[in-house]
């Protein structure tokens, strides 16, 4: 996994996770994260993109005929925030952020607000 920090404002995003090379059984990945995020937004974005990495590795997120599929269903017909792989990533991001804050910082977080980091501007 390579993590790249760069400006993603033009992409209306705080982060992306992409495979490098072939989409068949991908094992090399790049995670791009918006430069200069607040620390909590950076952590949430990284966790969100790591959920996507897990989806690729487990094979629940795939590319078929140039279209992204989640659990064998094309996601292209869904609006961004209704895409099932994004719904899962946002839900997991919240859980993982809670665990991180409790275990690393000793700060319980009851209901962290999701950052809605990827392509949110386009979805709204």
Can you say where each PLM-predicted feature lies in the sequence?
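Short pre-active-site segment immediately N-terminal to the catalytic Zn-binding motif
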Residues: 29-46
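Short, solvent-exposed loop/turn segments at secondary-structure junctions
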Residues: 8-9, 37-38, 98
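Long, well-structured alpha-helical subdomains associated
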Residues: 79-83, 93-124
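Active-site recognition of the HExxH zinc-binding catalytic motif
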Residues: 44-57, 89
